[in-house]
Amino acid sequence: MEQNKDPQMISKHNSRLPIWVLSPREEQQARKNLKTETYKKCANFVQAMADCAKANGMKVFPTCDKQRDEMKSCLLFYQTDEKYLDGERDKIVLEKINKLEKLCQKQSSTK
């Protein structure tokens, strides 16, 4: 999971908002992470569709309907169920909490 590694991100965090509130950029990152994870989980279906398309060329759509439907079903299963997106959001929130804890420890050790 690729995140913004800017150490100032936590210090710039708006203290009036709870840390679990995601910025639009963080929400976009959660959705991007979900897409990546979904394609990993459905890799066999995606590969089957790609192989069928490669083998059939211009006849891909009538010939590969079964593979397309299986791939679509798998991808939509993960992308439409909110618990998977919530899981990606939780990962980002946990990362923000960890960064904040490290920052607090660093500040307390310098005092």
Curated annotation (Swiss-Prot):
It holds the Pfam family Cmc1. GO terms for molecular function: metal ion binding. Keywords: Chaperone, Copper, Disulfide bond, Membrane, Metal-binding, Mitochondrion, Mitochondrion inner membrane. A motif (Cx9C motif 2) lies at residues 64-74. GO terms for cellular component: mitochondrial inner membrane. Disulfide bonds join C42-C74, C52-C64. Residues 39-82 form the CHCH domain. It is a peripheral membrane protein. It is found in: Mitochondrion inner membrane. The keyword Membrane applies. A motif (Cx9C motif 1) lies at residues 42-52. Required for mitochondrial cytochrome c oxidase (COX) assembly and respiration. Binds copper. May be involved in copper trafficking and distribution to mitochondrial COX and SOD1. Belongs to the CMC family. This is COX assembly mitochondrial protein. It comes from Saccharomyces cerevisiae (strain RM11-1a). The lineage of its organism: Eukaryota, Fungi, Dikarya, Ascomycota, Saccharomycotina.
